[in-house]
């Protein structure tokens, strides 16, 4: 018995493979037939050639074929002339069962007769008398063919609706007709397939006494316990409910909640009704066949049917319509600004969503039926042939639908394509996608107008130039991919606006911004004395883009980006005092990235700035920068961004204001331009579009070099910078970090900023301000001025020659403590911060201990000055320290401050000191409140603190 069932199982497997191969071939033929039928009449014709002779001994008989065709409503046409001869040139009607004419699908009577003459088929049909209940063999064959072709023909109705540019509701109705057709034809097919499946596998005897097995087409009325008003109508009701829900989803005027509800209704109707109907029908077959119908078996069947249904598919469809709804809302604003692309995207989502809803409903029903039959077959070899054939025919129909679905999607996409092309034609050839960026920019401008109009006041500039880079937009990218117009899309577009006295001006007459050539010209300043050039968003590198769409697979395309790059931005300024913040100008290009999106190979875009007249300020960015300051007092700032420590060596410069600045930017994150890929899907078609955009990418360390000309002051970074001055007058500000500053020759202005700095004035009359931190200060030769404030920390000063001064700019002289510590003079303020003047007493002590010692150095500071101009000389300090045994008494300091003669002397002397410090203030640090350059509140650099510089006299 075991071997018998093994042989049966093997036979079933071989039969299944044969059936599968045949069904696949049939599916291809049917699809081809359907495509050819688009322009022909949709009817089935039984074609009988003139003078055809048939063998009544072997065949079914021409009379039976004609009778069966008439019963089934198939037109019978006998060849009288050559009016349908063209059928022979289509699918070879004389050689095949199926053929095409301009009037419809042709069934070849000779080929059908040959089919019926085959031994296996003839025997199979002949032994099915009890099951077919009097139907002839011919009618069985014709009924099955008619059922399958009916589905194909209904599918052609849907295709025809698409070809006529029907709206979404029409498409849904066409889908409904297809659903109804499938319900009817699946039922008819099962009747036919039951008979064939039973006999082909030589198991007919097992089923000959199964009452009602072939009655599904008659709504199961022959099954025990079920009539056409119950179970059969449930099947129809479930499928029709699903199709009705598809209509709701197609209604663009329906609310979002209703559409979401429809999506769940679609799933629930199919899951509920189809599971119940299919499971009950299959159980009834098993009962009729005398097979088990226990709880576990019923559960297996029901669960298998349920698993064949995917509610997530319907949820995805509902999401599509929700997305379309949100796009429609989003599109309203941009439509008013002249761009309707978002609405086109919504139209695409609605159209494809409708198609998805219809096809998914049909496929769900087919999957449920096939799954249920297969589950029933799991416990019985008897039902296996039926299961295989049912699965096969539903698979053929599903395949046809899926192939049709892609064509439907492409049709919707083609409509979008045509609308874009038509718009460009009607608008003088303007790029549709560029128009989209224009609309995005205008919306952004409207949203930020209040902020922008306030910039003149906030930035303290008569004119503000705002440059905005509109970067890649995913909706625009989707539209370009769907419409197959990726070659026309741009990575973005740059815009410029001007504001004066809180008014928005047309900037095209005031500013030249040419991203293709790399030109930014703001030299036409008009009456404006001050202007601020603000890069609101990262500006992409200059150059032009070209794209090329290539096919990489059956449904895969990529639009490659080719960039004709310009190697530099050329910036031109005029007579106004201008501020440029270049930190938002992208200079680094990520040429090669690793798997983690880290930049491992870069390219650089240089900035060349010609500033002209005026007192200008430039904040340098991440790459090589060349600056010609021109006339005026010009500052170059490295205090914004995190672009490496400076090394400046101007010792060999032959022209004042000329510097070479070397920077090493350590590994970290910095603004880079990189190329990415946007993906848009149209059913199976995948469109990839390359585009460039800015991003903070992790990079390896790199070197960069800046060339400065006619620059009066350099402000350093937050790193440990090194400054070596020229033989001319230099002005350096270390900023944050532990900086080393050497003024070299010239009358230098040196500021340490934050951090424990080392500053050496070198030769010349230098102004030295250590700033916050414990600084080591050396004046060198010349008449030097040192400044200390409360909160600056503990400074150490070494001085040798000249008439030097130390100003405690926010402390009263009488509040300070003077005392001798070893060879040094230590001055302590009220915050207990100490300024140590190294070796103040060393020469005097050497003179006391060494006979005939002659002093060779003067390590003292000649005047120490309080915040109100009161002062004490080095001579007075020596006398009072001597008098107080190493410490000046507070009362003595008070006398010094209160002494009229000393005050009078202080007033007279203050004039000269005031002039000196006033001169020094022209070279003040960016830490000076008078030099803190305004930025929009949202863009303020916390490293630029405001420290009031109080004059010492």
From Swiss-Prot:
Matching PROSITE patterns: HEMOLYSIN_CALCIUM
Hemolysin-type calcium-binding repeat ranges, renumbered to this chain: 715-732, 733-750, 751-768, 769-786, 789-806
InterPro entries in alphabetical order: Hemolysin-typ_Ca-bd_CS, Hemolysn_Ca-bd, RTX_C, RTX_pore_form, RTX_toxin/Mannuronan_C5-epim, RTX_toxin_determinant-A, Serralysin-like_metalloprot_C
Highest taxon of source: Bacteria
Keywords, alphabetical: Calcium, Cytolysis, Hemolysis, Host cell membrane, Host membrane, Lipoprotein, Membrane, Repeat, Secreted, Toxin, Transmembrane, Transmembrane helix, Virulence
Subcellular location per the Swiss-Prot or TrEMBL entry: Secreted; Host cell membrane
GO biological process, one term: killing of cells of another organism
A Pfam match: RTX
GO molecular function: calcium ion binding; channel activity; toxin activity
Disulfide bonds: none
Positions of transmembrane segments: 230-250, 297-317, 359-379, 381-401
Note in the entry: The lktCABD operon has a complex mosaic structure that has been derived by extensive inter- and intraspecies horizontal DNA transfer and intragenic recombination events.
Record remark: domains: The transmembrane domains are believed to be involved in pore formation in target cells. The Gly-rich region is probably involved in calcium binding, which is required for target cell-binding and cytolytic activity.
Name of the molecule in the record: Leukotoxin
Protein's organism: Mannheimia haemolytica
Gene designation: lktA
